[in-house]
């Protein structure tokens, strides 16, 4: 990996608290980097890799349903985290390159090696997923609130 790529990866949720260790760098150096053109699907509901993707450069959109943009990803952002260790054969959304992108792909075996070599990265993964669970619980609260005012307050 290039120096700029290492800097970008060191800011992702796995390493943000402690930076890249030598062991982590050695594991990441064995992970593939894929390039995508503007408009190209990186992941789709039916065609995806069982890997966490870390955007090294470019910009991508997370799309749901009929092209509704849920999120915009930039360098250092990730996708595929929640679905990596599941048995589900479908990905939850589409990821499309808005600009040309380069993506580092960390497979489940690579992450397992990383977690064994770098406990802080494992904690970063757990923290990230815990944050997503809390976020989704807040959204559930919004949908199940007994009043319209309560739903709006929780939604905001």
Q: Model-flagged regions — what are they?
A:
Residues 71-127, 134:
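Cyclic-nucleotide recognition modules
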């Amino acid at each position: 990996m290039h120096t700029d790529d290492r800097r970008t990866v060191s800011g992702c949720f796995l390493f943000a608290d402690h930076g890249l260790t030598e062991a982590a760098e050695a594991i990441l150096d064995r992970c593939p980097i894929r390039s995508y053109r503007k408009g190209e699907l990186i992941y789709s509901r039916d065609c995806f890799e069982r890997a966490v993707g870390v955007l090294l450069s470019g910009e991508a959109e997370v799309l749901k349903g009929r092209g509704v943009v849920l999120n915009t990803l930039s360098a250092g952002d990730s996708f595929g985290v929640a679905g990596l260790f599941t048995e589900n054969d479908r990905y939850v959304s589409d990821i499309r390159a808005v600009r040309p992108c380069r993506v580092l792909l960390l497979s489940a075996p690579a992450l397992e090696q990383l977690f064994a070599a770098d406990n802080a990265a494992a904690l970063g993964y757990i923290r990230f997923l815990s944050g997503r669970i809390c976020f989704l619980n807040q959204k559930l609260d919004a949908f199940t609130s007994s009043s319209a005012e309560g739903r709006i307050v929780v939604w905001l």
